């Protein structure tokens, strides 16, 4: 996603037109907030970091991009304050983090729909069934050309792009398409950077990829989205179909906050408060589907209860 271009629209938020809440704290506060993890959550986290640093220029907020799995490893090692994730924490990750005696709070940010995309000149693959998607991506797949999927389609090799194994998108996609997480063919171009997939699909008429909805929305002139059919009619991802769950690959986006970091570092607690007060507007601006306001209010209450009460603010 072109995050820098995105910040032009985020400047509009800062005027208050989208209910942007300028959380008040010590303008001279110093410190560092470290986030790492999901490439899907990255646009929200990066936008929040930039807006927060306009208010608190002496606080350094770093946002890493090592994939959900990579972020969880760093979170479990105590290397970061916040892990960003495009899926729920796995049992093995929970166990490792608990063994490290790290207490945390899970905070929902928004909803997303993993989008299957093709080149704009692809006029044949307008929709796929979930069964066909499984045939394409299963280990040892016999699908090599478009004609292998449908006899009426071109006998041209499919160039596949997708997230790498550290990605939460990879985990969620394989679990919901294959029925087993991390089960996938390996002969595809794998990357933790969604822009690699955008570029690959936009330049190859016979390419296919899957990525977060915000990356499709930001680059829709460079690719077509494929409608997916699970039981009956094929459905394309949109704010409505993702929110109501009719799109087959709708999923949650979350962050995990180290409670000790929030308790001992006021800049971390203030950043999380700022994030949760503004994430609805930020999510919408970057192309994801915001949750209900009541969810954010309850989430912030839960976070404050876990970390010693409301953020202390000064004017």
Labelled PLM ranges:
Residues 1-7:
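Bacterial N-terminal signal peptides that target proteins for export
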């Amino acid at each position: 996603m072109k995050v820098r271009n995105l910040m032009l629209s985020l400047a509009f938020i800062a005027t208050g037109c989208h209910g942007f809440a300028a959380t008040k704290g010590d303008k001279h506060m110093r410190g560092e907030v470290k986030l790492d993890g999901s490439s899907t959550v990255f646009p929200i986290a990066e936008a929040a970091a930039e807006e927060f640093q306009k208010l608190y220029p002496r606080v350094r907020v770093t946002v890493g991009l090592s994939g959900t799995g990579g972020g969880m490893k760093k979170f479990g090692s105590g290397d970061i304050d916040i892990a960003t994730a495009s899926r729920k924490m796995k049992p093995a990750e929970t166990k490792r983090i608990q063994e490290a005696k790290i207490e945390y709070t899970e905070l929902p940010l928004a909803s997303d729909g993993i989008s299957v995309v093709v080149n704009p000149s692809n006029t044949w693959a307008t929709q796929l069934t979930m069964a066909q998607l499984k045939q394409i991506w299963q280990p040892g797949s016999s699908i090599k050309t478009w004609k292998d999927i449908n006899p009426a389609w071109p006998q041209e090799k499919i160039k596949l792009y997708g997230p790498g194994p550290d990605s939460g998108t990879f985990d969620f996609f394989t679990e919901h398409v294959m029925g087993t997480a991390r089960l996938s063919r390996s002969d595809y171009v794998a990357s933790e950077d969604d822009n690699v997939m955008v570029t690959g699909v936009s330049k190859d008429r016979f390419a296919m990829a899957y990525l977060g909805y915000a990356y499709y929305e930001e680059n829709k002139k460079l690719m077509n989205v494929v409608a997916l059919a699970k039981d009956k009619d094929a459905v394309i991802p949109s704010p409505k179909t993702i929110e109501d769950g009719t799109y087959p690959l709708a999923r949650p986006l979350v962050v995990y906050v180290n409670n000790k970091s929030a308790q001992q570092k006021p800049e971390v607690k203030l950043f999380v408060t700022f994030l949760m007060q503004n994430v609805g507007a930020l999510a919408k601006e970057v192309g994801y589907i915001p949750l209900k306001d009541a969810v954010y209010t309850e989430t912030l209450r839960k976070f404050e209860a876990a970390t010693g009460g409301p953020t202390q603010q000064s004017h």
